[in-house]
Amino acid sequence: MNLSRILYPALLLLIALPVAAEDRPFIDEMHPDVNVPDQQPWKEGAINLPPFPQEGDLVEFEVDGAPGQFRYFIDGKNLAIGDDKVVRYTLVIRSDSGANNISFEGMRCDSWEHKVYAYDNGRGEFRRVASPEWERTPKHVQGPHYELHTFYLCIP
């Protein structure tokens, strides 16, 4: 009888040891899958400034909740998706008085980011931004970048 008190726990321990030595997939680090190629980090392509937009090429779009004194356009002739998957476009914001704010921009649909590459220099030409940076596009703030991302340029 004393022997069975010692034998059963010892047998259970011997059975449990190989199970405990197995790989713990949610605890141990995963081994890379050799069948999946390594993903290269994203790299932005070269930027060429487009020609300055012409009035006849502007396509108006609506921005819900925006003040009524502005109208929004993109240059339909120079809208492109690069090999780097960045949508590049010229944005024109026009006030009721006729003043234009013109910028050449890029939008990364997958990461909800946008970047301004150049602005109107006041002489009908683009002036490059010295060090353009990607900015997060707010997902719940009505504005031209949200509208372009959600309803026009990044539709899945």
Each predicted region: which residue ranges?
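N-terminal signal peptide c-region/cleavage motif recognized by signal peptidases
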Residues: 16-20
